[in-house]
Amino acid sequence: MDDNGDVHFCHRATAVVALLLLHLVVVANAAAHSCDWCTPRHSTVSILPTPTHAAHLTGGACGFGAAPMELNVAAVTADLFRHGHACGACYQLRCRDRRLCGEDGVKVVVADMAKQPEQEGEMNRTAGGSLQFRITEDAFAAMAKQGVSAHELTRQRTLEVDFRRIPCEYRESRRLAVRVEEASRNPTHLAIRFLYQGGQTDIAAVEIAQANATPPSSSYYSSWRYMTRRDGAPGVWTTSRAPVGPLRLRVVVTAGSGGKWLRSDGEVLPADWRPGEVYDTGLRVTDVAVRSCSLSCAIQDMDSDDGEEEELR
């Protein structure tokens, strides 16, 4: 086999491996999140310590920075944070004390990982659960039922809640965006983070390519480069082999089971893309998982003492 044949064979082999890895990622993702769409699970929620507020959270482990989130932000403990996979996921929390709390609860988006001091862990063991959500005082007060003052609820500091994952809903003009991380170096080293990921979804794969390459040219197919999640920061996608810009991108979006490609129509990153900048992809993510609860989900969620818990609807 000549040198050109070797190169083409290597390209084909790399593509096959990438597709196999993508399949495994999508399947694993579906299995891990299938129970997110079922009946609500039980947890506790507490108020973030003063003077922590929303700006501190958006600068936390998820690295959203100064980007306006439009939703109440929350920090979650490690088991729910999932090494960063939960960044940008939306949840509905409803206090279980009907004397104090209303039916609608509060909707939050995950922006940080909550650290749990030893004394708080002890407090929540006696409360019957592990601390999983921390929210701002304003978000905590939003759970109060009509006729209950914000002060009356917030003085509780910690409450037991039902929680479930829900679709993220941003205003109509808000589309999926990418933030170029500070560690990026134009042109080859690129690290990005997604913002305003709507629906009830996870991003399972990301690829970038030169925006000026069009099918059926060979450069269109050969210029696509896959990105990988950064170790220790799954919300960041990175590559050291980025093509010269301007760049377009495509992503695999999963919603509980299966996945689909979404591809930008044109340029997303300009040739002179810069670290710290946010760029609009032109894509709108609205997929919602089909509510089909497996037996394993039902067993996982049947943790009440009397077996007659009210389902969060």
Swiss-Prot record:
Residues 1-30 form the signal peptide. One of its GO terms (biological process) is plant-type cell wall loosening. Belongs to the expansin family. Expansin-like A subfamily. Residues 59-173 form the Expansin-like EG45 domain. It is found in: Secreted. Keywords: Glycoprotein, Secreted, Signal. It comes from Oryza sativa subsp. japonica (Rice). Glycans are attached at N124. One of its GO terms (cellular component) is extracellular region. This is Expansin-like A4. Residues 188-281 form the Expansin-like CBD domain. The lineage of its organism: Eukaryota, Viridiplantae, Streptophyta, Embryophyta, Tracheophyta. Pfam families: Expansin_C (PF01357).
